[in-house]
Amino acid sequence: MSAIEVVRPGMLTTVQDWPGRIGYWHVGVPPSGPMDDLSFRIGNRVLGNPEGAAGLECTRGGPALRFPDGGRVCVTGAPVVVTLDGTPVPQWQSIAVPAGSVLDVATLTGPGMRCYVLVAGGLQELEYLGSTATFTLGTFGGHDGRPLREGDVLTAAPDSGPLDGRPARAAIDEQPSIGHRWEIAVTEGPHAAPEFFTRADIETIIGTDYTVHFNSDRTGVRLVGPKPQWARSDGGEAGLHPSNIHDNAYCVGALDFTGDTPILLGPDGPSLGGFVCPVTVVAAERWKLGQMAPGDTVRFVPVRADRAPSLRTIDVDRRASFPLVISTSSDNDDGVLSRFIASDGTDVTLRRAGDGGVLVEYGPMTLDLVMRARVHVLYEHLLAQDIPGIIELTPGVRSLQVQFDPSAMSIAEMTDLLAGLDGKLPPSHQLVVPSRTVRLPLSWDDPATHEAIQRYMHGVRADAPWCPWNIEFIRRINGLDDVAQVHDIVFNAEYLVLGLGDVYLGAPVATPLDPRHRLVTTKYNPARTWTPENAVGIGGAYLCIYGMEGPGGYQFVGRTTQVWNHCHPGSAQSFEPGTPWLLRYFDRISFYPVSAEELLHLRAEMAAGRGDVAIDDGKFSLGDYQDFLTDNDASIAAFRQQQAVAFSAERRAWDEAGEFRRAS
C-alpha cells in the first residue's frame, strides 16, 4: 500500500470504479461510476490494472497530488495540462512518479468536461453495496461519500507492474474524440411515436442540434431545443402534462422529457419516474455524456440496436475515435418490440429500453392494481429462474424493466423469452403477498417544503399554477371545497407501495388503496432543482417520499422521517441488518400528524440509529381488494367524476393561460 496526499482537490474530484454499483436499481440506487467510462477504462488498461479499478474522476479541473512513495499514473479524458514537479507530461500513457513528487492536473479549458487520474494498483476505499464509486447526492461510496478535500490521504494498492506485452500508452485510434459538437447513437424507445410523440416530434428530435444547458451534472445532461407538440393532450391519471406516464424504470442514457425539458439521464440519475423517454443512448456511446460541456451541440443518430458497438470493448471496435456516427438505418419500429394479447385477455407491450433493456407493460395506461400484480408475478418468476445475463429487474406501476447483458443474449432473444412466458405464470388475480403496515409521522405543510417552493419561484419559475402553495393547487385540481379536505384525505389514506426508488434511495411510489383517497395532480414543469430529504408529495395519482435531497416534481404535502439508513452497515432500529432501505413492495403506509419541531427531533433520532417506526406484518389479497372495489363502486365512481370535472376545468384554465404553449 502507498499513500497519496491531496495538495489541491480540484473543482470536483471523486473516487469512482467501473461498472459501479450494480444490482440495486430496483431500490433507487444508481450505478454511479465514471461518467466517461471509456477514458477511465483505457487508463486502467494502460497501467495494467483491471479495467474497473478505482480511480479519480475530475470535473472541470484536476487535483494536485503528492506521492510520498512514488508510483505510476495515467491521465486520460478531456485534454488538460498535466505536470510532474512543474514539467509537462503527456496524457494517455504510463508516467512514473518519483517518491515525493507532485502530479498537477490543471483546469480544463475545453473541449470536454472530465479528465481521469488512474493509479497503478488502483485506489483502495471501503465498498458500499459492492462498489467504491462515489454517489455524492447519497453521501456514500468513495472517500467518505464526498468529493476530495485538501489534506485528504488516499491509499493505492501495490503496483503489480505492467502486464507482459501491454502497451505503455493508448493508441491514437483508441482514444475517444472529444470536441464541441457531438453525434450520439440512439435506439428508438421506449416511449416514442405515435402514442406519446407525434411523428413530427420524432423527426425534430432526430434532426435538431440541441445545446447543452449549464445546469447539467452527473444526474443528467439537460438540453435546450424545440418544445414537442405531443400526441396526447395530457397524461390522464399520471398527470396533466402529456409527458406524464405511470411510473416506470428508466435506464442510464435515456432522453427523459421532464415536461417539455429533455434530459439525458446520467450514471447518478434516478431509476424510477413518470416521464416519457423517446430514444435511448446505446451503452457504448454513454461515455460521451461525461464530456458534454455547456454550449456544446448534440445531434441524435438512430441506429439499429443489434448493430451497436459493445460496451465491453474499449479498442478500435468501439469506434470512439470517430466524431461522427455512421448509421444506414434505425430499427423503424417506434421502440415497440412486440404487442400481443395474453392468454387471459391482457394487452402486453414489450418496448425497447436501449440496446440492453426491455420494458414489459401490462394493460391500458391506467392505474390498476391487477396489472401491478401481474408485474409482481413476472418479477418473482424471473428472480427465481436466475437467468444468466439478466442484470437488473425493476418493477414500475404497470411495467417491469429487464436490463441484460447484450453480449449474453440479443434483444430478440430476450423478447422471445419474455413473450414465451405467457400462460406459464401463476394467475395474478389470486395473488396474496406479504404486506406490512408502516406508520410514519408527517409534518403537514412543513417549513422545508415552503423553502423549496420559494427557491423554485426565485430560481426556476414564479408563475407556475402550483405556486405559491402546492396544497391549494391539489385542492383546486381535485374539486375539493377547502384544504382541510386535502389534509383529511392524506391522513385517512392507506398507501400501497408499488415501486421503490422514486426518487432515489428506497423512496416509495405508492397509491391509496381506496380510490376515493386518490388525489390526482400534475408534476412540476420544469422540475424543481432542490427538494428536501424525505419531503412527501403527490404526482399523478401517486405519493412519493423523497429518499434524499435533489430534483423533484411532486406537489408537496409535508415531510416525514428517513426511509434510507445512512448508518449502513451499522445497525438501526426498523431497518433490517445489511438492508439500508426501510420499505418493501406492497407495504401499506399511513401517516400520523406531528409538528415541524417534533419531526426534527424524530429525524435526529433516526439519523442516530435510535428512531423506531411502527411496522406490523400482514398480507394483501388481490381477491379481497377486488371485492372491496365492487362493494363501493357507486361512491368511487362519484368521487372520480368530481375529480374529472375539476381536472378538465384546470386543463382549460391552463390552455387559456398558454401553459401548454409555454417554452421550456
Label every model-predicted segment.
Residues 1-664:
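Conserved "landmark" site that anchors the functional core of diverse proteins
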